[in-house]
Structures are given as structure tokens and as C-alpha cells.
Amino acid sequence: MKRTILGASTLVTLLVLGACGSSSADTASSGASDATEIKVGTGNEALPYAYLDENGEYDGYDVAVVKAIDEKLLDYTFTFEGADFPTTLSNLESNKVQMAAYEYEVNDERKEKFVYGDVGYVVWDTYIVSDPDAGTVYDSFEDLAGKKVYVTTATNQAAMAEAYLAENPDAFELVYGEYNNEQIVQAVTSGAVDATLAPEYQVDNWNNSFSENLEIGSEPVHNSNAYLLFNKETDQDFIDAVNTALEELKADGTIKELSEKYLDGDYVPE
């Protein structure tokens, strides 16, 4: 399997990825003075899921979901620790954070290292994304023969593409990185890569944010949901409380409202 890491010289027009790998903290709510602090790993440049707003405060769909859970759990107070996607997983594994909210889908490698929450909070159906002005719209992995495909390191999108390539060696070339949204879009529109993998609402966000016309294939190449993720040493009573709170927030329509606010549609799993 071909494996490429794009460096700065390859994409000279891209911005330097600020804050990548670094962390910053923000408290979800004040909570009771004797409440147990839970550090929550998330993103700081991952619109529309987790990012720092113009005031330096954490915002986004995943952040809002966690804040809603925190409001229901009076015995706990949540503090956000921002980083890129793979660093957040490393922070969770080392117990620097006890919980992570970063659109984590289920895969076997993570199941060995972490504990997944029981309640899915967003549909994550993955499509092949491309720029029709620069090439072709791709409906399936078979259509990507001989192409370059960007995936973020340690994501489920990387894992699913790797699984396909394990059975179809050299079908296409994977390009790995930890790009922010702007860098991913520029990689696709500049022709540095031919395609990437993402859900439909992420592509809508890219097009709206950067005035682009990226398109998705006619069908998803993978269907799944995203879940909260916990360190294996995290207290089970806390995990159970989070699961219960999230189920209640789905039942009362709160999660649907947040999905419509941040994702421009109802992407809440059944």
C-alpha cells in the first residue's frame, strides 16, 4: 500500500496548522464547588464539531453536546482540552483526559484501548469527496483507481480505506496528515489529492465556509455513528451517568436541536 505524508513543501499555499498537537482548557460549566472535574478531549480547529470561537471559547456540535450533558450531571464539572485528532486519542490513552468527544466512530483498534459510550449522538455516513471542477465525482472506492486520497491520521476514514487497500493493494494512494478544514479543502481543490472522505454535512460546511463546490458520491462508502469515548480507567458510574444523560437529551429533542444548529439538519441516530 502506498503511504504518503504531505509536507509543507508539497502544499506551499496552505496555512501552517496552528495549535495542532497543543492543548488548551476551558470549563464547560461552573458546577458545584465539590463537583468532580472531568477533562474532556476535543478539537480546537474542527468545524463544525469542536473549535475555538472568536472569543477563544470552545464551541461546535460535539462541544455543545458535552455541555448539555454537563448541565444534567451536577456531581461533575467538565473541562475541555483541545488538540488535533490523533493527539486527543493519545491524551485519552494516557489519561490526560478521561473522556473524548471528537466524532469517534467504532473500530476494533479503539475498542481494545478505550471504552465507548452506549449512545450514538451523530450519524457518520462517509462519502468520497472531490472537486468536480478539477476532476471527477467518485461513487465508490473502485472509482479511485490510481488516485490520491487524503485521510486524517488515526481516523476511521483512514482505517476503512486501509481495509480496502489490504484486499486491493495499490488500488489508490493514501495521503496522511493532520490538516485543518482549510488545508483539506485546498488539498482537494488544488489537485494535490484527488479526493478525501467525509460525511455530507462536513462537505456542506466546507463549501459554505470556503465558497467551494465540492461534491460527494451518490452513495456512502461506509455507514456508522459517532460515540463518546472514555479512558479504560474512567469510573464506570460516571460513564453510566453520561450514557443516561445523553439518552435523555436525545429523547427530549435537545440533541436534535443542536444537530440542526451546528450541522444544518437532523443527523441524530435512532
Q: Where would I find each of the regions flagged by the language model?
A:
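Extended ligand-binding regions for polar small-molecule ligands
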Residues: 21, 63-64, 68-73, 135, ...
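Acidic, polar ligand-binding/catalytic clefts
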Residues: 79-143, 215
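Ligand-binding clefts/hinges and TM-proximal coupling segments of bilobed small-molecule sensing domains
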Residues: 22-25, 76-79, 156-176, 215-217, ...
